[in-house]
Amino acid sequence: MLSADIKTVNISPDEIKKYDQIVDIRTPSEWQETGIITGAKTITFDPSDKSAFLDELSKAVDIKKPIALVCRSGRRSTAAAAAIDNSVLKIINLDGGMSSLIEQGYKTTPYKK
């Protein structure tokens, strides 16, 4: 079985532009509160139900291409990256999360259900 290449990068407005596939793993209330990265897929990561997360992920993105994960601060995306280690070939953990990105002036897109 192949193991994923997991890379952690500091999140910044410029860094965001590098990724075609971004998955925001926060909760709907968090998406509603702050907005999301333009073009990001929204899939909540629940550590108690990793298989459901993987199912949703494989439907939303091409798991053979790099996937950038973002949460509020970087902790959940680290856990999610570890959970999907064998399912995706390249994972980028956006460290600092949405909190850091917003502090740096990134203008989010309002979340719509």
Predicted feature locations:
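Short, surface-exposed ligand- or partner-binding patches at beta-edge/loop junctions that are enriched
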Residues: 70
